[in-house]
From Swiss-Prot:
GO cellular component: plasma membrane
Name of the protein this chain belongs to: Putative manganese efflux pump MntP
Phylogenetic placement of the source organism: Archaea, Methanobacteriati, Methanobacteriota, Methanomada group, Methanobacteria
Keyword terms of this UniProt record: Cell membrane, Ion transport, Manganese, Membrane, Transmembrane, Transmembrane helix, Transport
Spans traversing the lipid bilayer: 5-25, 38-58, 67-87, 107-127, 133-153, 164-184
Family: Belongs to the MntP (TC 9.B.29) family.
Function: Probably functions as a manganese efflux pump.
GO molecular function: manganese ion transmembrane transporter activity
Gene of this entry: mntP
Length: 184
């Protein structure tokens, strides 16, 4: 399946919503982050959003020959599950991401946790026999930009919008899954 650039950008934005939400939280809970620490957030989130679809793709290619006839259904259910999980997590009231100080350990855990969805999208890319470099690069760049932007916006706006962006990201992934399913 040849996915258009617009679809790839939409997927990247949807995947970046978790990192954006976490970054918003960091912005309004850690007012003392330096510019270099903010840059680390962007780099870590961007890198893991880039690499996890690659890992998912590698895993997906090992099974794609067995499931090529059901690939659209698998893609749909993967994106549906990811989207619903993002929405469910956003409706939970606990603020699991809030911590008081900057640490690379925490940053790595947050970057991995927010990129698990990208791993599943990588499996979907493999099942749909998509190219990998352009989508992963766009996903990483968008996550980088959204992470840094989220921190700056969070510093200015506070806690009000965090969960709503994650709901939007989940809804977009579900809609993309439906689009993939209807395209076959």
């Amino acid at each position: 399946m040849d996915t258009s650039l617009i679809s790839i950008i939409i997927i990247a934005i949807a995947l970046a919503m978790d990192a954006f939400s976490v970054s918003l939280t960091k912005g309004f809970t850690q007012k003392n982050l330096t510019k270099s620490q903010i840059l680390y957030y962007g780099l870590f989130f961007g890198f893991f959003q880039f690499i996890m679809p690659v890992i998912g793709y590698i895993c997906g290619t090992t099974i794609s020959s067995f499931v090529s006839t059901v690939a659209p259904w698998i893609a749909f259910f993967l994106l549906l599950a990811i989207g619903l999980n993002m929405i469910r997590e956003s409706l939970d009231s606990d603020d699991e991401y809030i911590m008081d100080t900057f640490s690379f350990k925490e940053l790595t855990l947050l970057a991995v946790a927010t990129s698990i969805d990208a791993f599943a999208v990588g499996i979907t890319f493999a099942l749909l026999n998509m190219s990998l470099l352009l989508p992963c690069t766009i996903i990483g760049i968008v996550a980088f930009i959204f992470s840094i932007s989220g921190i700056f916006i969070g510093k200015k706006l506070g806690n009000y919008f965090g969960d709503k962006f994650e709901i939007l990201g989940g809804a977009v992934l579900i809609l993309i899954g439906i689009k993939i399913l209807l395209g076959y």
